[in-house]
Amino acid sequence: MMALGAAGATRVFVAMVAAALGGHPLLGVSATLNSVLNSNAIKNLPPPLGGAAGHPGSAVSAAPGILYPGGNKYQTIDNYQPYPCAEDEECGTDEYCASPTRGGDAGVQICLACRKRRKRCMRHAMCCPGNYCKNGICVSSDQNHFRGEIEETITESFGNDHSTLDGYSRRTTLSSKMYHTKGQEGSVCLRSSDCASGLCCARHFWSKICKPVLKEGQVCTKHRRKGSHGLEIFQRCYCGEGLSCRIQKDHHQASNSSRLHTCQRH
C-alpha cells in the first residue's frame, strides 16, 4: 500500500513539473517569438536616411534605385561612375562625348546620354540613333518626317518671339533635297563621309566640322603614336592623294621640338 502511494506521489510530482515548465513564459513563447521576428525582419528595418522621423518600424521599399540618366549607361545613383572619353567613338551608340556642364572644366569629358528628337545639338553624335543634327536641332533621319519636324520645331521655338523674326517669315521651310546635300566647309559632321568631296571631318574645339583636305606644301600633323589625334583640339585633315606628311627638308637640322611637317609627294 505504501509502495502504491509512493508511485502515485511520484506521478503527481512529474505532472506538476511538466505543467510548470509548459507554462513558463521563456520556454513556451520563445519558439513563437523567434518565428515572428524572423518572418518580419525585413519589415522592421530602420528607415533610410531622410525618411520620416519617429517611425522606426516603417516598411522598407523594395523598389530599385533611382536611375541616373546622364551617363554612358543607366545605373543607380550609388553605382554611377562617369566614363571618361576623348572622342565620340569611345562612347556607346546612344551616347556622345562632351563636358558634363557648360562652362565646366574643358579638359574633362565623359560619355553623356544622347539627345532625343527636336532637342538642341551641335553635331550628329549628340543625337540619338535614327536622328541627326540639322541647323542645331536633332531631327529624324527619315526623309518623310524631315520637313515636318523642322517646320514644327522652328515654329514652336520662335513663334512667339516677334523681335527675332521681325521682317522675316514666321515659318521656314527647307527643301527635302537638303537631306542629300553633303556638308560644306564648316558644317558639323560625324565622319568624313558626311562632308563634300575634298573635305574631311576633323575636330574643332569639342565638336567636329568639315575641313579641307591638305594640299602639297601645307603644314600637317605627324602622329607618332596611335590614338594621339584624339588629344587635338584643332585637328587637321590628312594629306591629299599622292601626298604624305613628312619633315620639311630645310628643317632637318632644327631641334626635335621645332620640326615642321608638310604634305609632300611620295
Swiss-Prot record:
Pfam families: Dickkopf_N (PF04706), DIKK1-2-4_C-subdom1 (PF21481), DIKK1-2-4_C-subdom2 (PF21479). This is Dickkopf-related protein 1. Glycans are attached at residues 61, 256. The keyword Glycoprotein applies. The C-terminal cysteine-rich domain mediates interaction with LRP5 and LRP6. Placenta. Residues 1-31 form the signal peptide. Disulfide bonds join 85-97, 91-111, 114-128, 121-133, 127-138, 189-201, 195-210, 200-237, 220-245, 239-263. InterPro entries: Dickkopf_N, DIKK1/2/4_C-subdom1, DIKK1/2/4_C-subdom2, DKK1-4, Dkk1_Cys2, Dkk1_N. One of its GO terms (biological process) is regulation of synaptic transmission, glutamatergic. It is found in: Secreted. Residues 85-138 are annotated as: DKK-type Cys-1. The gene is DKK1. One of its GO terms (molecular function) is co-receptor binding. Keywords: Developmental protein, Disulfide bond, Glycoprotein, Secreted, Signal, Wnt signaling pathway. Residues 189-263 are annotated as: DKK-type Cys-2.
